Design a protein with these regions (language model features):
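Helix-loop-helix hairpins in multi-pass membrane proteins, especially solute transporters
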Residues: 58-210
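Hydrophobic alpha-helical interface/terminus motif in multipass membrane transporters
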Residues: 22-25, 110-111, 145, 225
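Internal alpha-helical transmembrane segments of multi-pass membrane proteins, especially GPCRs
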Residues: 2, 37-40, 67, 125, ...
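Short intrinsically disordered, low-complexity coil segments enriched in acidic
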Residues: 1-7, 54, 153-156
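Membrane-interface helix termini in secondary transporters
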Residues: 24, 51, 55-59, 144
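Hydrophobic transmembrane alpha-helices of multi-pass solute transporters/permeases
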Residues: 1-21, 29, 201-225
Length: 225
C-alpha cells in the first residue's frame, strides 16, 4: 500500500507543478489564451478514454495496462519538455493528460482489487491524502523549477525520470502476482484462436472505438463553439 501512496503522491505533486509550468510556458510563447483550449481538449480526451482503458485492464492485464499508460504519460512529458510552440505543447499536454488519467484509474482499480468492501472508503481516502499537502507544496516547487532549476522545461523533464523509476517497479509487482496467480491455478488465460485481422476488429468493437471517437468529437465541438 505504501508504494501505491507514493505513486499517488508523485502524480499529485507533478500535476501541481505542471500548473505553474504551463502558465510560464504559454507566457513564453506569448499565447496565454490557448491555455484554456489545451486544458479543455486534454480533459475531454482523457475523460472519454477512461472507458477503453478500463477494458484494456480486463483484457490485457494490470501490468500491461500500467506500462502502456506510463509510456503515453512519459511521451507526453517528453513532448512538453521539448516543444517549441503552443501547438506542440497542446499535443504533448493531451498525451500527458491521457496517461495521467489512465495511471490514476489503474491505481484506483488496484485499491478496489486489494481492499475489502468494508475498508474500501478508508483506503481511497488514505490514497487521496497526497493531494492535500501537494496543494500547498506543489506551487512552491513549481516556482522553484521555473526560477532556479533550468526553467519550466525541467519541471517536465525531471518527472520523466522520477515517474519511470516510481511506476515501473509497481508494474513488476503487478506482473509478479499475476504470474503467481496463474501458477496457483486461481485463473487461466485462454487463447482466442483469432487471426490478426479478427483481433483488430474484435478489439475495435470491445473498446467501442467509433462511439469513443464520436463522443470526443461531439464534446470538443460543444466546448469550442
Amino acid at each position: 500500500m505504501h508504494r501505491i501512496w507514493i505513486c499517488f503522491f508523485l502524480l499529485a505533486l507533478e500535476s501541481s507543478i505542471s500548473t505553474i509550468a504551463q502558465q510560464t510556458a504559454y507566457a513564453k510563447f506569448s499565447s496565454a489564451p490557448a491555455v484554456s483550449t489545451a486544458n479543455i481538449l486534454a480533459s475531454i480526451v482523457g475523460g472519454v478514454l477512461k472507458l477503453p482503458v478500463g477494458k484494456v485492464l480486463n483484457i490485457w492485464g494490470r501490468a500491461e495496462g500500467l506500462c502502456a499508460s506510463l509510456f503515453v504519460y512519459i511521451l507526453g512529458l517528453i513532448i512538453l519538455a521539448a516543444c517549441d510552440g503552443p501547438s506542440s505543447y497542446a499535443a504533448g499536454y493531451v498525451l500527458y493528460w491521457v496517461g495521467y488519467d489512465a495511471l490514476y484509474l489503474i491505481l484506483q482499480v488496484f485499491i478496489a482489487d486489494t481492499s475489502g468492501l468494508r475498508n474500501r472508503a478508508f483506503a481511497f481516502a488514505f490514497a487521496s491524502t497526497p493531494f492535500i499537502c501537494t496543494a500547498f507544496t506543489g506551487p512552491l516547487a513549481g516556482q522553484n523549477f521555473v526560477d532556479n532549476t533550468g526553467g519550466w522545461r525541467w519541471a517536465y523533464g525531471a518527472f520523466c525520470i522520477i515517474q519511470t523509476a516510481a511506476f515501473l517497479p509497481l508494474a513488476g509487482v503487478f506482473k509478479y502476482y499475476e504470474t503467481k496467480g496463474l501458477k496457483m491455478g486461481l485463473y487461466q488465460k485462454e487463447r482466442s484462436g483469432r487471426t490478426v485481422m479478427q483481433s483488430l476488429v474484435h478489439y475495435f468493437i470491445e473498446f467501442d472505438g467509433m462511439h469513443v471517437f464520436l463522443l470526443i468529437k461531439g464534446i470538443s465541438h460543444a466546448n469550442m463553439s
